[in-house]
């Protein structure tokens, strides 16, 4: 048994039960973005949260314990992603990554955007030419320090 096995059980149960991530998140009173990441194995749940997730997805006590183990974050394969949606993010960073970096440094100075002190919001935006995806990534700026 591994955390990946628990993730697969969660995805299977979600499909079989016809659940939406937003509905799961509402039961935890947390964002759909964070709860989805947690259910997919990228965040650590506390005991109370793990119990709720275990109840929603009919997980065992052993599975529930795996939800509370600190994950190996960013554990996607290191090769270029082949899933079309994930690849588009890879492509966006390849095309716009240096631009984003330059604009952040120009605005804030030398540093990084935190993925720890971080929020994400994903919304559908109606458009007569076809609905659009609006993703806001909100991370604390962390300047490099001199020593």
UniProtKB/Swiss-Prot annotation:
One GO molecular-function entry: cyanate hydratase activity
Enzyme class, first EC level, given as a word: lyase
InterPro entries referenced in this protein's UniProt entry, alphabetically: Cyanase, Cyanate_lyase_C, Cyanate_lyase_C_sf, CYNS_N, Lambda_DNA-bd_dom_sf
Source domain of life: Bacteria
Reaction equations catalysed: cyanate + hydrogencarbonate + 3 H(+) = NH4(+) + 2 CO2
Keywords for this protein: Lyase
One biological process term in Gene Ontology: cyanate metabolic process
The EC number(s) this enzyme carries: 4.2.1.104
Active site: 88, 91, 114
One Pfam family linked to the record: CYNS_N
S-S bonds: none
Homology family: Belongs to the cyanase family.
Task of the protein: Catalyzes the reaction of cyanate with bicarbonate to produce ammonia and carbon dioxide.
Protein name per its UniProtKB record: Cyanate hydratase
Native organism: Methylobacillus flagellatus (strain ATCC 51484 / DSM 6875 / VKM B-1610 / KT)
Gene that this sequence comes from: cynS
């Amino acid at each position: 048994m591994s955390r990946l096995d628990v993730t697969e059980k969660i995805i299977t149960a979600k499909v079989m039960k016809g659940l939406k991530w937003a509905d799961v998140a509402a039961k935890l009173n947390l964002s759909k973005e964070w709860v989805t990441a947690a259910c997919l194995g990228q965040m650590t749940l506390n005991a109370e949260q793990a119990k709720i997730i275990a109840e929603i997805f009919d997980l065992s006590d052993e599975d529930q314990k795996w939800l509370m183990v600190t994950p190996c974050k960013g554990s996607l394969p290191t090769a270029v992603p082949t899933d079309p949606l994930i690849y588009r993010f890879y492509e966006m960073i390849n095309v716009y990554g240096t631009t984003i970096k330059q604009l952040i440094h120009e605005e804030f100075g030398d540093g990084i955007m935190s993925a720890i002190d971080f929020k994400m919001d994903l919304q559908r935006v109606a458009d007569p030419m076809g609905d659009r995806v609006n993703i806001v990534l909100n991370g604390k700026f962390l300047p490099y320090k001199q020593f």
